[in-house]
Amino acid sequence: MRYTIKNEYLKVTVDSKGCEIVSAITAADNREHIWQADPAAWKRHAPVLFPLVGKYRDNSVTYNGRQYHMTQHGFARDMEFEPVKIEDDKLTMCLKADASTLEAYPFFFKLECTYRLDGSSIAASWRVSDTQDEAMYFSIGAHPAFVLDGHESLTGCRIGFAMDRYGVEAVNPDTKAEGISYRLLNAEGLSLIHI
């Protein structure tokens, strides 16, 4: 099911499958800003990545002696979220652990995703709760794709982040990440590929 929130600047549509933004249209010019999921290039719009960002080696991990299988970027993007609160300019949806998630991920969780319109911006927030009293390991992220109308060439384009430092640090600085075969960010910024 799809839900729409709007204000005087934006109209945003979110699909309950994956709690994925599938459309963001500006009121002033009726322009779509979200990639419209052409399967020839990429079938998604703006998936929520949980409980894994990236992938496990061989798509599996062992935890407490049991092996769990999970594909790249986790399962949330392919699951049905339930609406929690729907307002004109704000939507909160929820995904909870169930028998199918426990086959891939050994933790009882509750993931709440909220999209709130703030003027001409979309504020996204996630709240992950451990519904049992044990350490819960996870990662979470977003993978939005945008429409770049009017750009014949992206030569010279770059995306910058207004941060003095990145907010992610190594859990154990003495270990080395394995299985990563490319760098997306470098001194020049984020690489863009025009398809």
What are these regions (language model features)?
Residues 1-6, 98, 110, 190-192:
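Beta-strand-rich recognition/accessory modules
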Residues 1-63, 67-71:
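Beta-strand-rich N-terminal accessory domains
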Residues 3, 91, 122-124:
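Hydrophobic residues embedded in beta-strands of well-ordered beta-sheets
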Residues 6-8, 18, 55, 75-78, ...:
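Residues that act as N-cap/strand-start positions at coil-to-secondary-structure junctions
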Residues 10-14, 113-115, 159:
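Broad, structure-driven detector of short, well-ordered beta-strand segments within folded domains
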Residues 66, 70-119:
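Extended, loop-rich substrate-binding clefts of extracytoplasmic carbohydrate-active enzymes
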Residues 97-151:
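Acidic, contiguous internal or C-terminal segments within carbohydrate-active enzymes
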Residues 137, 145-193:
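Active-site/ligand-binding surface loops and adjacent short beta/alpha elements
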